[in-house]
Structures are given as C-alpha cells and as structure tokens.
Amino acid sequence: MNTNDFDFELPEELIAQTPLEQRDASKLLVIDPVTREMTDTHFDHIIDQLNPGDALVMNNTRVLPARLYGEKTDTHGHVEFLLLKNTQGDQWEVLAKPAKRLKVGAKVSFGDGRLTATVTKELDHGGRIVEFSYDGIFLEVLESLGEMPLPPYIHEKLEDRDRYQTVYAKENGSAAAPTAGLHFTPELLQKIEAKGVKLVYLTLHVGLGTFRPVSVDNVDEHEMHSEFYTLSQEAADTLNSVKAAGGRIVAVGTTSIRTLETIGNKYDGQLQADSGWTNIFIKPGYQFTVVDAFSTNFHLPKSTLVMLVSAFAGREFVLEAYKHAVQERYRFFSFGDAMFVTRPSEK
C-alpha cells in the first residue's frame, strides 16, 4: 500500500478554524459500507444510529494547557516547550524550540520564575527530558501559565479553552483533544442514556504524534507513536456484557478504537481491566475484534487516521465519502464535522 492511495483533494477553506457555537449542531455524514449508502444529517441525530443495548465508548482524557513560553535563565533567549508526557515525578518529555540551545543542565524560567525547568536529557527531533521546579500544585501552575496546544492547521486564537475539551474530560494528560467527542453535549448524552445505551469511559492520552504526517511511501514502513491508555474493570465488564447480549460496541473516535482493539487483541476479543502503552497501527487488512461502529471527524489526507477508517469501511468507499463531504462543504479536522460508520456485516 502506498501512502498516496489515501490522498484526496481538500480546499483549505474547509479546514474549520473555530468550533461551532452549539457543539451538536455540526453536520454528520452516516455511511454504510455494506449498502454504500451515505446520509447527510446533523450530529444531534446520532441517537438515531444507536440501539437500546448498545454501548457508547468515549475517551475521557483531558487536554493540558501544554504549551509554555519562557526564557533561558542565562541568556534570556526565548524558549517554547510543548509538554508531551509525564515520565516520572516532576520529569516530563517536552518538544523544545529552539532545541539546539538547550543542552543538558540548561535552565528555563516561566512566568517570572513561578515555574523553572532543568534539561536532564537530550532526545531526537527536538525532544528533551526536563525536571520542573515550582511552588504549590503543578497542574494549577500549568493552568495559569500554559496555553492550549492547538493543532498546526488551526491559526485562529481559541477564545474559550473549554471548547477544546470534551464535556466529559476528566483525566489530565493529553497534548491534543480526542476531537470526535467535542460534538457531544450533556443533554445529548442524557438522551442517549435514556434510550437504553450504556455510556462507558476509557482513557487514552493523545500524544503529538497524532498530527505527525506519514513520511514514508510504503504504508507498512510507518512507525506509530505510543500513547498511554487505561480501561477499568467496571468498563470492561459492562462492554463484555453488552457484547454477550448482542449489543454493539460503538466507539467515539479513533483513540477509543485503538484502545479497545489493543486490549481485545491481548485477550482474544474479550476486554479486561488493562493499562499500558499502545502503538497499534490499524490499516486496511486489519480484522476488528471489538468495535462494531464508530463516530469520527474528517481527517487529514494521507494520515494514519484515514487509513484506520479505511480498514473499517474500505478505502475506495471512504474516499468516495470524503469526496461527498467536500462537495457538500463539510468542515474538516479538529473543529469540523463528523462521520458515523457502521461495520460491514460480513466481518
């Protein structure tokens, strides 16, 4: 498979720069790979795609205001950090700019010294391990000094930080939002639950690699980034019960899919309480063991996320659906519209 097989034309003006005023007012394209039908609707009608006895699985990670601007304590040169993951204690892996000036031992100050960082290790591609020093609680200091790490294709300033969080965001740790969940409102979730659908939460902390383009021609040579996930025993039991009773596992977003499939692959299609790092790469040819249907946003051309959707619904049909979305002026990427995909019945 060639990376160019997953390319498509996307006018730049269709890349959503700001969220809609009402979360669930976004458009929803429902696609069925078996009948090859496509239906244009709105996200608040996603409830029509869910049946009593199904489980809706959402990623409750919370985005950290992970972009920090500071200065080197010796030269006062400007420095930018993007926090990627907490390695241990007060140590974090960060993406640093300009990295070449930040050798081991370099100190960086943020917010007039309220937060300082010492470089303890140099990594590839501008990565650094740093140890932070501060007074009080780290997350509170970060909330006051940090900025939301919006994706590189969003150029507008975000007026309200909460619009880059899902309404059910709970577990701190992501460098990017699980954007398929941004469309849900508390009222919509209440209606879905009242219909007899189980609401289930897992956690996968989204890393910066989610935006990393595929730089190789041969898809099989691409290496996925690792992300940390957790599924509780209660959630696993609920999902196994739903499956056993003939209900569907409906995932919200690619992060939920990757978590469920990672665990399902470990335990022969069953789910158990589990946590760890996953670098699962789902591409055409992959056999799904857990997920029966899902919602997702519209993704970048040639991205691993388009490949994942293609693994589920077929590359040609997915590209047809994307072409339809472009013609119908759907909004793309993080603040854009959504797609609901049912699973081919022959699998």
From Swiss-Prot:
One of its GO terms (molecular function) is S-adenosylmethionine:tRNA ribosyltransferase-isomerase activity. Pathway: tRNA modification; tRNA-queuosine biosynthesis. Transfers and isomerizes the ribose moiety from AdoMet to the 7-aminomethyl group of 7-deazaguanine (preQ1-tRNA) to give epoxyqueuosine (oQ-tRNA). Keywords: Cytoplasm, Queuosine biosynthesis, S-adenosyl-L-methionine, Transferase. Belongs to the QueA family. Monomer. The keyword NADP does not apply. It is found in: Cytoplasm. Its EC number is 2.4.99.17. This is S-adenosylmethionine:tRNA ribosyltransferase-isomerase. Gene3D superfamilies: QueA-like. InterPro entries: QueA, QueA_dom1, QueA_dom2, QueA_sf. GO terms for biological process: queuosine biosynthetic process; tRNA wobble guanine modification. It catalyses: 7-aminomethyl-7-carbaguanosine(34) in tRNA + S-adenosyl-L-methionine = epoxyqueuosine(34) in tRNA + adenine + L-methionine + 2 H(+). One of its GO terms (cellular component) is cytoplasm.
